[in-house]
């Protein structure tokens, strides 16, 4: 990172000191004294790490002195070396000499203290929250960062943004910026700054218009305005942050082709819904609630019906309501303007505010408990009225839906009572759902507005998401966030080191690729893979009785002890309870699973949601338009096996969104920003060490440093390294001659005493391991100290010598002066000397006059000359000014040209690098694609053959599965049809009731019409008849209700159905009462109308006659309809009889289901509930009947009065003619409706009869299908026996075949030697032929390459001649092209030489010419490379390069002609050798074919007989020859065998209940065993061949390694899954048996209870006859009730609803005791009323008996059949679900076994690769030889034909056989290398495990030592205190003395 000067930093303005150190600070840091050996960081408990100085080292302990003066003794591993002062406040921490935690921490701390909040750490940009405003985001800073590379400017979020923008423009690739961190770390602020930067540098400036033409602001304004709106609804105050984002967001900013903003969109994740209804004390809800109540917009307060005090609303006032740093009033205006800018319509804006206000009102809704019930009811409706008004709902409907939601039971909806707590929970869930859906809808609308439909090409995504969270209480939300960060960290690790390793590859460093993205795979798979945490959570959500405990147990069963990342948490006092722990990359997190199932299902009140969907507010209706309940979803999709999207769990939706996010990120080039919170108190400048270290671990900064340390984090250019470290050994680099910087660096490093494995040389840089650069710095400092000391000594000597010479000169001058002074003192008194003193001055005055005259003349001349020179000077100055201007202009032009040239060179270099990288990538991709295509082709061929081989084995399984699936489908269809029939019959009942109502309405209208006519008496008669019929119907309904009530006593199991019927009947009764009231109102209206229309009837007498006729016709029609209704009733009775017949047939099924399922705990509880409810219903019904009778009597009286009045008014009816004309048309319409209703009744009748007939047909079909199924089972058993006999026959034939093969082998041993000789000759010939063919092929390939190179050079020459002005870029392109071509040609030629050297050892005389040509080609390549280097060094020599290219062209023509000649010669030789080989091979194969095949068959059969006995052991030895894995596989084998026994035992136990599956399971097991034995036989058969195939195919090793590892992991996973499934199967079967036993016991108890109840009823009746009998019967009843209660408590003590059952039973006992007491007290009154009661009872009994005799034969059986059918259908469905679940589990197990076998086959096939074809052909020959053996046994002539056919086929396949043998040798090498690699991996794994165990033991030891040290410190401290006390005492004593 280059350090800028102060002048260069001036462009940043006042932000410069906050971005980079000044030059003065850098110089001071470099000159600061520093001792690298003693300056260290030391681990310290309070401060984590402190700066210290080493005092001494002794025995693994180090004594240090800290900066604070304290002395500490620590272990060596707790001491970390300090970086030199020049690294203080370094801008990129990855460049530090010593990379460790304290170095990173103190670098961040020192930069933070200087307010430099941005720091790089490799690919990361780390930012620390300053908690104050810094001037680093001003416009001049944005301008300063624009277009700057990362290394050219200080670290900043603007630098990251600009780099992403520039990469997008240059690389044409999407970019992403990932901003993570804890709450309060500054993620949202940095996201805003990124958006601000893009909105500044990529502005379009065009304003958008909506349809009305209103300006909505520019796209930049809208992007910026999206933040205030999202913050208002998605941000809240937390403990750490006043403006914390409670959701994650991914903002995509799209750019056009010119780099200008085109559009944007936002995706959100994990909105914290719970904050809507609950906040902690120091927090508050979302900002929008407090903005609304800030009273900035009073009209908003008035519109939302709220107050300005947030404490009036429970949902938003649980914590704080104000934030000092936020002005809610200003924020409201910003939010309001943002809504307008973003283009929301006024209606949508009002809807947003209204829904927000409704959520606030929801929190104030009150509910209370009804008296004597657990049912909730509203406690006031004022708040509900406000909420309903704001949501455009009906308040009564809303309250009813909350307190009495409709729940689907079976096929009908019933009203369910809710407790107060359930209602409050439902209100909270609805509030959260409304808020969440509104938030998501707003995001969608914002995206629609930001989508400008402009052309867009690339985007930059900004991810603002919460960082890793480790709290005291971690729930599902924390798991989701931490899982997201795991995925992001894995993504970063992979990306970071891929870039790092790409640089290694580009620099030519040998490096084995390490994918650090796999480091976190274990934790990620534990969470998201099948049978992971999310999978188990979703599975539990599907079970209605699942609890948190069952979820925890499943987690423990599946993962505890099996996954290293899953642990059981430690119990810590004072800490929240935890259920399991996960080891994440950032630390171990304890999770609490309480309430996870409810959170994941996220249930809502479906009835209220239905109201929302029908709301008049369009926004609310659209929010829930796609919602469907779980019941509706399941019922609507019974036929399908998929879950509907409407019933998607929270975890599934989260994973789907996360996968989309990761897909988006993988398609981009990422940039990483990590935000750090320095302290918890929001204090500027303060930094808490432990807090920051925790975040660095969680954010992956330390993880990134760990990855850096694995590679070569320090790197220096060769020139810089030579200049800086030449001082270490100057003699290593000779002076006076030029030497390359790379060679100089190599010599210099080789001459230094360091570890030479710690550095590598690249093409342009030297790379160092972590710490080595620090060692070089120490050595340089020592060397500099020596040199400076020596230099100082020389300088001091020189200075002293100079000073000495000066002292000598001063001495001589003093001597001279002293001599002259002495002489002057001797002569000064002489007379002549005095005269001399007087005359001397006079002589000088004369001389001075002369001098003055001359000086005046000179002065005048000089003045004239000066004037001339001044004129000339002015002229020259003017010329100089013009010249300076021209010079400056030229300098500016030169500078601009130099800059443009430098930019062009940089771009050219960048393009060259990119081209090199892309060409390398293209080459790798093409090679991979070719390899993958070859592998794919081989795999597809093998797969097809395997499928053909297995198809016959699978046919029976598939047929059986198809037949069983068909039977099951038909069963389901039959059951569905039965259910549909019952539903349709219920619907018909409803239609009949509706028709009866309509008939009544018609009769009433007719009666009213007849009242208007003269024939009023007829009308009165009709009305009376109608009323009598109505009363009869009412009586019938009452009787049916009584009958249903009595039937419910006998049909306890159908409670839900009967309750629904009862409520429907009550509703129909209420409807009838409403109809009667409506009739009364209509009568009153008619009376009023008649009074008004009497005057008009006289004019309509003629019309009256016609109407009377029509009325009579209609009356006749009504009578006909009545007859049809009676007929319909008869048909209905007939249908009910048919249903009763069907019910008898279905009762058998129900008995089986009762035995299988029985009565559940809920049914037993419902039995008890029903007894109390039936008593209550009987009383209610009696009251209802009394009220109904009174109402009917009142109606009759009222009707009689109205008839009397109408009789009086008959004379005045003549004046209603005009009214009757109008009513005539209405009457016609009613008549038409009546006729259509009659037709509908007749159609319904016909449909009912058809359905009855179809039901009968379905029952008969079901019987026939059951018979067919039984026949299929019998066929399967017969087929099994037949297969066993066939197996015996095959074994016998195998023995015979062995004997025959032995005979053949003995008969053909005589010709072995001759065939071996011929074989040897043939092999030599084929080797020579193959060598020539390979040489020819390589020669052709080289010719093609040379031809292509020649064409490219011609094009290059023409291009250079055409465009010499563009010589720079073109020469660079040619340079890179020729470099890559030369490298490729070199590699290819070297490979060709190696192949030729290996394959043509025995035929060197045939390829000497080829080697000579290769050498000439090498020379040509060297000459070409030299010419390319000349072009690269000097651009001006392009003409010379063109001449060289012409010369090369001629040389290539010569080479090409030589190659063509050689090609023709080799072609001729090849054809001659092919002819000879064909003639020889035909003769050879005639003699050889029979023997080879028989010999191969003999060997394979012998190996088969041997290996069949040890197939498992051979397989395990083949897979794991490394040692320990043998034991593991043997354990797995034992587990598999044990699991197989368990499966068989479980299947035998379930045989009684699953007889229809037994045959299928046995058949599948038999076939699996057969397939397994056959595959094992084949594998064992090929063992020896595999031993020969383990020698070659080195390329396959690399691809096969990952495949084998994956197969081993998948096999282990499959074994675990299989074991888990089998365990679940056993548990379910045990539970089924247990449930059967409980069902039988409960059924017996139920029957006993019924008998007891009957006996109790008899005893109570006897009690009415006498007091003594009553006491005795009461005692019996009490005893039996107690017994029954005890039995019920014993049976259902473990169930959750036992307490309620017990309370109900106790209440019943209390009622009974109260009744007994009443009987005791009223004994005398009972005796008096005894006779009356007996008479009443006898009358009631007689009536009841009559009713029962009349109706029980018809309706009782029908209704019983219906209810039984419904219950049986439900129970059957449950059993079928259970069976289907078991079947799915079984199929999964079978599929797992098949997949394992298939994978094993694929692994073996991949290992065999080319040899597989030979194996398959040999297998084909085995089959053919088996046929030949059978034919020989039969002594048939077909054997001869078969032999001839085989001879022909062998001739055709001979060539390929020879190639296959070579492949065998290659595969042998392959397998050997593969096994060696497996062993090395095992050793690495064992070493890693041992290292981890050692580290763990060290940790425990250290922890123990730390505890001991703390104890010793405490003891020492106490001793020190004691000594201090003693010393004080001694001191006081001494002072006292």
UniProtKB/Swiss-Prot annotation:
Region of interest: Actin-binding: 658-680, 760-774
GO BP of this protein: ATP metabolic process; muscle contraction; muscle filament sliding; skeletal muscle contraction
Q: Which residues carry this modification: N6,N6,N6-trimethyllysine?
A: 132
Modified-residue entries (Pros-methylhistidine), positions: 756
- Where's the Myosin motor domain? 88-781
Summarize where ATP binds, as residue positions: 181-188
Q: Which residues form a coiled coil?
A: 842-1937
- Phosphotyrosine is found on 389, 424, 1463, 1491
Query: Which PROSITE patterns does the entry link to?
Result: IQ, MYOSIN_MOTOR, SH3_LIKE
* Keyword Signal annotated: no
Stretches with biased composition (Basic and acidic residues) = 1127-1146
Q: Which residues carry this modification: Phosphoserine?
A: 392, 625, 1091, 1095, 1161, 1236, 1242, 1260, 1291, 1302, 1305, 1473, 1494, 1513, 1553, 1573, 1602, 1713, 1725, 1738
* Domain called IQ: residue spans: 781-813
Give the start-end ranges of region Disordered: 1126-1146
Domain Myosin N-terminal SH3-like positions:
35-84
GO terms assigned for molecular function: actin filament binding; ATP binding; ATP hydrolysis activity; calmodulin binding; microfilament motor activity; myosin light chain binding; myosin phosphatase activity; structural constituent of muscle
The alphabetized UniProt keywords are: Actin-binding, ATP-binding, Calmodulin-binding, Coiled coil, Cytoplasm, Disease variant, Methylation, Motor protein, Muscle protein, Myosin, Nucleotide-binding, Phosphoprotein, Thick filament
Present the record's domain note. Answer: The rodlike tail sequence is highly repetitive, showing cycles of a 28-residue repeat pattern composed of 4 heptapeptides, characteristic for alpha-helical coiled coils. Limited proteolysis of myosin heavy chain produces 1 light meromyosin (LMM) and 1 heavy meromyosin (HMM). HMM can be further cleaved into 2 globular subfragments (S1) and 1 rod-shaped subfragment (S2).
Subunit: Muscle myosin is a hexameric protein that consists of 2 heavy chain subunits (MHC), 2 alkali light chain subunits (MLC) and 2 regulatory light chain subunits (MLC-2).
Q: Which family does it belong to?
A: Belongs to the TRAFAC class myosin-kinesin ATPase superfamily. Myosin family.
- State the function annotated in the UniProt record: Muscle contraction.
PANTHER family named in the record: MYOSIN HEAVY CHAIN, NON-MUSCLE, MYOSIN-8
Q: Which disease is it linked to?
A: Carney complex variant: Carney complex is a multiple neoplasia syndrome characterized by spotty skin pigmentation, cardiac and other myxomas, endocrine tumors, and psammomatous melanotic schwannomas. Familial cardiac myxomas are associated with spotty pigmentation of the skin and other phenotypes, including primary pigmented nodular adrenocortical dysplasia, extracardiac (frequently cutaneous) myxomas, schwannomas, and pituitary, thyroid, testicular, bone, ovarian, and breast tumors.
What name appears for this protein in its UniProt entry?
Myosin-8
- What organism is this sequence from? Homo sapiens
């Amino acid at each position: 990172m280059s350090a800028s000067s102060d002048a260069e930093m001036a462009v940043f303005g006042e932000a410069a000191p906050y971005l980079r150190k000044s030059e003065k600070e850098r110089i001071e840091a470099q000159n600061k004294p520093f001792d690298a050996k003693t300056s260290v960081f030391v681990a310290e408990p309070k401060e984590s790490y402190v700066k210290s100085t080493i005092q001494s080292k002794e025995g693994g302990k180090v004594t240090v002195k800290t900066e604070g003066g304290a002395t500490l003794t620590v272990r060596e591993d707790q001491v970390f070396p300090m970086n030199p002062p020049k690294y203080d406040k370094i801008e990129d921490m990855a460049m530090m000499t010593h990379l460790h935690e304290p170095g990173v921490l103190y670098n961040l701390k020192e930069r933070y203290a200087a307010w430099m909040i941005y720091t790089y750490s490799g690919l990361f940009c780390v930012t620390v929250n300053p908690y104050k405003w810094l001037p680093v985001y001003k416009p001049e800073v944005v301008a300063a960062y624009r277009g700057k590379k990362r290394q050219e400017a200080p670290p900043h979020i603007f630098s990251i943004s600009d780099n992403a923008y520039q990469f997008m423009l240059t690389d044409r690739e999407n970019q992403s910026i990932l901003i993570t961190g804890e709450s309060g770390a500054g993620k949202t602020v940095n996201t805003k700054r990124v958006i601000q930067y893009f909105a500044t540098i990529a502005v379009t400036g065009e304003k958008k218009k909506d349809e009305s033409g209103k300006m909505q602001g520019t796209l930049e304004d809208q992007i910026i305005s999206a933040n205030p709106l999202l913050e208002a609804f998605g941000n809240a105050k937390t403990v750490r942050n006043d403006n914390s984002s409670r959701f994650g967001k991914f903002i995509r900013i799209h750019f056009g082709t010119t780099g200008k903003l085109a559009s944007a969109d936002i995706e959100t994740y994990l909105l914290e819904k719970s904050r809507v209804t609950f906040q902690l004390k120091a927090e508050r809800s979302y900002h929008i609630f407090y903005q609304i109540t800030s009273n900035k917009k009073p009209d908003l307060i008035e519109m939302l019906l709220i107050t300005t005090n947030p404490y009036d609303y429970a949902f938003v006032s649980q914590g704080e309501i104000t934030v000092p740093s936020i002005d809610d009033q200003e924020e409201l205006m910003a939010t309001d303007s943002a809504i307008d800018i973003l283009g929301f319509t006024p209606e949508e804006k009002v809807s947003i505010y209204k829904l927000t206000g409704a959520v606030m009102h929801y929190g104030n809704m009150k509910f209370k408990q009804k008296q004597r019930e657990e049912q909730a009811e509203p406690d006031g409706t004022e708040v509900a009225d406000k909420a309903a008004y704001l949501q455009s709902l009906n308040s009564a409907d809303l309250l009813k839906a909350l307190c009495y939601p409709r729940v689907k039971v079976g096929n009908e909806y019933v009203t369910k009572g809710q407790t107060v707590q359930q209602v409050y929970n439902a209100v909270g869930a609805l509030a959260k759902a409304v808020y969440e859906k509104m938030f998501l809808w707003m995001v969608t609308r914002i995206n629609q507005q930001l989508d400008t439909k402009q052309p867009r090409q690339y985007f930059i995504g900004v991810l603002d998401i919460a960082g890793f969270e480790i709290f005291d209480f971690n729930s599902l939300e924390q798991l989701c966030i931490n899982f997201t960060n795991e995925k992001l960290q894995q993504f970063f690790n992979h990306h970071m080191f891929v870039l790092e390793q790409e640089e290694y590859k580009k620099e030519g460093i040998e490096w084995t690729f390490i994918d650090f993205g796999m480091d976190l795979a274990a934790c990620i798979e534990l969470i998201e893979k099948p049978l992971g945490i999310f999978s188990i959570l979703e599975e539990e959500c599907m079970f209605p009785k699942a609890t948190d405990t069952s979820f925890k147990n499943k987690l423990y069963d599946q993962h505890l002890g099996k996954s290293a990342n899953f642990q059981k948490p430690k119990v810590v006092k004072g800490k929240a309870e935890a259920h399991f722990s996960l080891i994440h990359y950032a630390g171990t997190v304890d999770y609490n699973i309480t309430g996870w199932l409810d959170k994941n299902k996220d249930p809502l009140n479906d009835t209220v949601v239905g109201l929302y969907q029908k709301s008049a507010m369009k926004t609310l209706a659209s929010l829930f338009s796609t919602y469907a309940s779980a019941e509706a979803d399941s019922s609507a999709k019974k036929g399908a096996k998929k879950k509907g999207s409407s019933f998607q769990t929270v975890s599934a939706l989260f994973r789907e969104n996360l996968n989309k996010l990761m897909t988006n990120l993988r398609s981009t080039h990422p940039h990483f920003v990590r935000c750090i919170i320095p302290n918890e108190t929001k204090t500027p400048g303060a930094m808490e060490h432990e807090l920051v270290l925790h975040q660095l671990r969680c954010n992956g900064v330390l993880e990134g440093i760990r990855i850096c340390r694995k590679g070569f984090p320090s790197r220096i250019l060769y020139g810089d390294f030579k200049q800086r470290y030449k001082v270490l050994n100057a003699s290593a680099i000779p002076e006076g001659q030029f030497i390359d910087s790379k060679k100089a660096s190599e010599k210099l490093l080789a001459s230094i005493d360091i570890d030479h494995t710690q550095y590598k040389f690249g093409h342009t840089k030297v790379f160092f391991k972590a710490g080595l650069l620090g060692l070089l710095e120490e050595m340089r400092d020592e060397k500099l100290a020596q040199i400076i000391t020596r230099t100082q000594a020389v300088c001091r000597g020189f200075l002293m010598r100079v000073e000495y010479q000066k002292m000598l000169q001063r001495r001589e001058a003093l001597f001279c002066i002293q001599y002259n002074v002495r002489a002057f003192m001797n002569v000064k008194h002489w007379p002549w000397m005095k005269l001399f003193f007087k005359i001397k001055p006079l002589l000088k005055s004369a001389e001075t006059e002369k001098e003055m005259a001359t000086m005046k003349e000179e002065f005048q001349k000089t003045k004239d000359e000066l004037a001339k020179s001044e004129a000339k000077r002015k002229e020259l100055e003017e010329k100089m000014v013009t010249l300076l201007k021209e010079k400056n202009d030229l300098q500016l032009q030169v500078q601009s040209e130099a800059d443009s040239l430098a930019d062009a060179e940089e771009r050219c270099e960048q393009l060259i690098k990119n081209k090199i990288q892309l060409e390398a990538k293209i080459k790798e991709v093409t090679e991979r694609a070719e390899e993958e295509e070859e592998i794919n082709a081989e795999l597809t061929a093998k797969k097809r053959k395997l499928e053909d081989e297995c198809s016959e084995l699978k046919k029976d399984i598939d047929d059986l599965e198809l037949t069983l699936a068909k039977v099951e489908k038909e069963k389901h269809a039959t059951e569905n049809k039965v259910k549909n029939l019952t539903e349709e019959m219920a619907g018909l009942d409803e239609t009949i009731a509706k028709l009866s109502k309509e008939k009544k309405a018609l009769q009433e209208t007719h009666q009213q019409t007849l009242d208007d006519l003269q024939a009023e008496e007829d009308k009165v008669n009709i009305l009376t008849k109608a009323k009598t019929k109505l009363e009869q119907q009412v009586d019938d309904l009452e009787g049916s209700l009584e009958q249903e009530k009595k039937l419910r006593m006998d049909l306890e199991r159908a409670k839900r159905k009967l309750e629904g019927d009862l409520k429907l009947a009550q509703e129909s009764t209420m409807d009838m009462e409403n109809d009667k009231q409506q009739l009364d109102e209509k009568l009153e209206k008619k009376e009023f109308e008649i009074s008004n229309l009497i005057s008009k009837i006289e004019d309509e007498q003629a019309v009256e006659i016609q109407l009377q006729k029509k009325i009579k016709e209609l009356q006749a029609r009504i009578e006909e309809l009545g007859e049809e209704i009676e007929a319909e009733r008869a048909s209905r009775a007939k249908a009910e009889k048919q249903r009763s017949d069907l019910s008898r047939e279905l009762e058998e099924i129900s008995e089986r289901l009762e035995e299988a399922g029985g009565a559940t705990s809920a049914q037993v509880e419902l039995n008890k509930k029903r007894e109390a409810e039936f008593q209550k219903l009987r009383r209610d019904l009696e009251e209802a009947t009394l009220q109904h009778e009174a109402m009917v009597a009142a109606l009759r009286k009222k009707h009689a009065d109205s008839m009397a009045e109408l009789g009086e008014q008959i004379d005045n009816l003549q004046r209603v003619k005009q009214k009757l004309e109008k009513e005539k048309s209405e009457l016609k319409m009613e008549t038409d409706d009546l006729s259509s209703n009659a037709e509908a009744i007749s159609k319904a009748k016909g449909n009912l009869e058809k359905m009855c007939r179809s039901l009968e047909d379905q029952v008969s079909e079901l019987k026939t299908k059951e018979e067919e199924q039984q026949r299929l089972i019998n066929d399967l058993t017969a087929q099994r026996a037949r297969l066993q006999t066939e197996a015996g026959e095959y074994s016998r034939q195998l023995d015979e075949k062995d004997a025959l093969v032995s005979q053949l082998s003995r008969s053909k041993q005589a010709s072995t030697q001759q065939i071996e000789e011929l074989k040897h000759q043939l092999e030599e010939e084929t080797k020579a032929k193959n060598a020539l063919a390979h040489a020819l092929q390589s020669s052709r390939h080289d010719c093609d390459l040379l031809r292509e190179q020649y064409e490219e050079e011609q094009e290059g020459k023409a291009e250079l001649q055409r465009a010499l002005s563009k010589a720079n870029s073109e020469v660079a392109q040619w340079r890179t092209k020729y470099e890559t071509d030369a490298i490729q040609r070199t590699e290819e030629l070297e490979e060709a030489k190696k192949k030729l050297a290996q394959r043509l050892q025995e035929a060197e005389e045939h390829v000497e010419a080829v080697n000579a040509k290769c050498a000439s080609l090498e020379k040509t390549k060297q000459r070409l490379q030299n010419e390319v280097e000349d072009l690269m060094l000097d651009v001006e020599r392009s003409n010379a390069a063109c001449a060289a290219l012409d010369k090369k062209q001629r040389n290539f023509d010569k080479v090409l002609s030589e190659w063509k000649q050689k090609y023709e010669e080799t072609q001729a030789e090849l054809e001659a050798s092919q002819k000879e080989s064909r003639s020889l091979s035909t003769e050879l194969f005639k003699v050889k074919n029979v023997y080879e095949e028989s010999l191969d068959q003999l060997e394979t059969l012998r190996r088969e007989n041997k290996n069949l006995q040890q197939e498992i052991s051979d397989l395990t030895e083949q897979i794991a020859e490394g040692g320990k894995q043998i034991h593991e596989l043997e354990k797995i084998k034992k587990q598999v065998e044990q699991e197989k026994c368990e499966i068989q035992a479980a299947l035998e136990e379930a045989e009684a209940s699953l007889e229809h599956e037994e045959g299928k399971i046995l058949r599948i097991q038999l076939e699996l065993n057969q397939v397994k034995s056959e595959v094992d036989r084949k594998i064992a058969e090929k063992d020896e061949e595999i031993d020969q195939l383990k020698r070659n195919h080195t390329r396959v090793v690399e691809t096969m390694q990952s495949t084998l590892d994956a197969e081993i992991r998948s096999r282990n996973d499959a074994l675990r899954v299989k074991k888990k499934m089998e365990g679940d199967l056993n548990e379910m079967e045990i539970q089924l048996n247990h449930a059967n036993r409980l069902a039988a016991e409960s059924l017996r108890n139920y029957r006993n209870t019924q008998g007891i109840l009957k006996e109790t009823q008899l005893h109570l009746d006897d009690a009415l006859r006498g007091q003594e009998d009553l006491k005795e019967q009461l005692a019996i009843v009490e005893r039996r009730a107690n017994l029954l209660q005890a039995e019920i408590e014993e049976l259902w003590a473990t169930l959750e609803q036992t307490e309620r059952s017990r309370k109900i039973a106790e209440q019943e006992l209390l009622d009974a005791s109260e009744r007994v007491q009443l009987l005791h007290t009223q004994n005398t009154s009972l005796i008096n009323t005894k006779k009356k009661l007996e008479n009443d009872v006898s009358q009631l009994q007689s009536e009841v008996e009559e009713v029962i005799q009349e109706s029980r034969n018809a309706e009782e059986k029908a209704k019983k059949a219906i209810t039984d059918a419904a219950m049986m259908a439900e129970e059957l469905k449950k059993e079928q679900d259970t069976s289907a679940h078991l079947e799915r589990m079984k199929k999964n197990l079978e599929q797992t076994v098949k997949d394992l076998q298939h994978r094993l086959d694929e692994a073996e096939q991949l290992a065999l690769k080319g040899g597989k074809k030979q194996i398959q052909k040999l297998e084909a020959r085995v089959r053919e030889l088996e046929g030949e053996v059978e034919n020989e046994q039969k002594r048939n002539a077909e054997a001869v034909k078969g032999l001839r056919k085989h001879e022909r086929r062998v001739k055709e396949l001979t060539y390929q056989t020879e190639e296959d043998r070579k492949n065998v040798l290659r595969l042998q090498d392959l397998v050997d290398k593969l096994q060696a690699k497996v062993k090395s991996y095992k050793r690495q794994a064992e070493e890693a495990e041992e290292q981890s165990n050692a580290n763990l033991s060290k940790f425990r030891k250290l922890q123990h030592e730390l505890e001991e040290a703390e104890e010793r410190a405490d003891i020492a401290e106490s001793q020190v205190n004691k000594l201090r006390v003693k010393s004080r005492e001694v001191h006081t004593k001494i002072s006292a003395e």
